[in-house]
Amino acid sequence: MLKKLSVIALATMALAASATSFAKESLLDRINQKGTITVGTEGTYAPFTYHDESGKLTGYDVEVTRAVADKLGVKVEFKETNWDSMLAGLKAGRFDLVANQVALTTPERQAIFDKSEAYNWSGAVLAAPKTETRIQKIEDVKGLRAAQSLTSNYGELARKYEAVLVPVDGLAQSIKVIETKRADFTFNDSLAILDYIKKNPKSDLKIFWESDDKVGAGLVVDKGNDEALSKISKAIVELRNEGKLKALGEQFFGRDVSVK
């Protein structure tokens, strides 16, 4: 579920970062002066950032950001934009931060941006019908049929454990072929599976295995704003300790996703 960024865009932003002036106003000063945090987000990436039936912008990332703003004592203004230009917009100063399931795992991104304390974690899971009795551990998938995109990391995981791949285009098709018994299980992102189960309570799908190797998403700011980042991370830790992140996880995914 976590976002990708082109090498070209990263290179462009790296050049911009090298030209940043030391006299630049700090992010914390700017936020305090405005009394508002300006946030870049897609608004079309459910269940993280989307519009509900009433048209209100909501989602896990959106509500976490609102809670962080409350902790900081400022208002929040969301600016919806497409993903391809979002981090470039952050670098250009259109936003104070980005809330859009960004993991910031690559060295290229880490050289340009900083990420707060993680507010959710995700990793690979194995999902199959509740009635499945052959799978007790991941090694048990050997010889079973896995509904996977052939070129995905999850497809590679299925090959590693010697499953028979049933080609699909995405999660929706994976679930369909499992329901029609043309496949036995699928490897996929934990948040994607939890979102599906939450939205489809009558589904027969169940998580049988979950990877210990997880990636955390956080709020992203331009490089060099350590003071603001520290306050944002402190707010996220407080929200976790107070149970707010757990409550939001249960609201959007059916369980707490704020811990590994």
Identify the role of each PLM range.
Residues 24-26, 153-166, 204-208, 234-260:
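Ligand-binding clefts/hinges and TM-proximal coupling segments of bilobed small-molecule sensing domains
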Residues 120-125, 190, 194-237, 255-260:
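Periplasmic-binding protein-like
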Residues 62, 78-88, 133, 151-152, ...:
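Short helix-initiation/N-cap motifs at beta->coil->alpha
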Residues 37-38, 73-75, 92-100, 144, ...:
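Alpha-to-beta junction loops
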Residues 63-71, 145, 150-153, 216-255:
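Extended ligand-binding regions for polar small-molecule ligands
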